[in-house]
Amino acid sequence: MEQKQRRFTKNVFVLDQKRKTICGQIAARQSLPYCQIKIGRNFALRAVATPEPKGYVLEICDVGAYRIQDGNDVISLMISADGVEGTQERWEEWKFESDLMRTNGHSSKYKRSVGRREIKVSKGMGIVPPYTRNDFDRRELPELPGVQRSKYDIRELRQKIREEREKGAVEQPHKPAFKTERGMNRPDSDEDQNPAGGVVNDWTCETQKRDQEAERREALEIRLADNDRESKHSNWIVRGRGKILKEVKNSFRTQEVERKKSDMGEVIIEEDDEDSEEEEGARASYITSAYIERISRIRKIKDERLSMLASMMPQQSGEYTTTLFIKKQKWDNVPLYLIDEMQKKYELQSVGSCERVAFVSKGTNLIILPVASNPR
C-alpha cells in the first residue's frame, strides 16, 4: 500500500482590521487582533493576541481566495464573510491570489515569555473573489502549430514508448552488422527464414568477428609502432640532454677548481692528500704563503669596492682591464710585479718586499699585484 505523504500543521494568522470576513468577526468578538487558522490533520479557528513563532501572518482587507506560497509549502484559503475553507493539497479548479511570504524578525510575548522571534508576513489585496471558477482546463491540449494530438492519453503513450524502446533494445544484439551480397540484392528467401538455415547467419557472424579481430590487430600494430618511435625519440632526447648536462658539469667543475684556487678565504681547504700534493707541485714557486695570507686578510675585510669581484691568482705575466686603486702597504716575501698602465699588462720581476699594492680587475675577477719598486 502506497504511503501517503505526511502533512505538517501550518498556522496562518489572519489580520482583518476592517472586520469584513469571518476571521475579522471572530477576532472582534474576543477583542483580539488576529484569527488563527490551524491547517494540518485537523482544521481549527480561534482568536489570538500575537502570532506564534514561524507562523504565517496574512493581512487582508476584504474577502477573497488567497494562496500562500513559501518555498515548497502552499496553503490555499477561501475566506468569505460567513466561512473559511483551506487545504495544503492541490486545488486547481478555483482561481487564487498568490501571496509570497517575507520573513521578518520581531519581539513579542508568547507563552508568558517575551523574546525575539521569526514570523513570515504577506498582504492580500482581495483581487480574486472566493470560489471563482478556473476557466483553464489543464487536461485540455491547446491547438499548437506543428503538433498533432495523439489518440492515446499520456499513460498509454508512455507505455507505448517504453515498449518500443525495450523491443528495439532486445532486437538490436541479434541484428547482423551486414548482409551477404545475395541478401542485399533481393529479399530473404524461405530458406533464410527457416530456422534450419542458421548456417548463413553463423557464417556472417564468424566473418564479422574475423574482420573485427583483423582491425584490432592492425590498430594494435600501429599503436606499438607509434610507441616504439616515440620511445626512440625520447631516448635520443635523453641522450642529448645527458651529453649537454655532462659538458655543463665538467665546465662547472673546472670553474669551481679555479674559484677554489683564487678564493683566498678557502684556499687552505684540501680535499685529500693526493690533490694537495699535486696542487703544491703545480703551483708556481713565486706564490708564497705570505702572499696568500695577505690576500686572505683583504678578503675577510669585505671591502665594498671588491665585494662583487672574485679573487684570481696572478700569473707570471698577463693583462688586466681596469686599475681599481693602488694602496700603500708594506709586504714582505711576496711576488713583485712590473705594471705597464698604458698597455695594461703586468710581469713578474722577483720575490721580495714592496711598499705599494695595486688592485686591478680582469672582467669580474680581482687580481692583487704587489708593485716592484725597481726594474730588473
Curated annotation (Swiss-Prot):
Biased composition (Basic and acidic residues): 163-188
Keyword Transferase: no
Record-level Gene Ontology MF annotations: RNA binding
Species of the source: Epizootic hemorrhagic disease virus 2 (strain Alberta) (EHDV-2)
Protein name stated in the entry: Non-structural protein NS2
Source superkingdom: Viruses
Chain segments carrying region Disordered: 163-201
Biological classification of the source: Viruses, Riboviria, Orthornavirae, Duplornaviricota, Resentoviricetes
Family: Belongs to the orbivirus non-structural protein NS2 family.
Biological function: Single-stranded RNA-binding protein.
A Pfam family assignment: BTV_NS2
Annotated keywords: RNA-binding
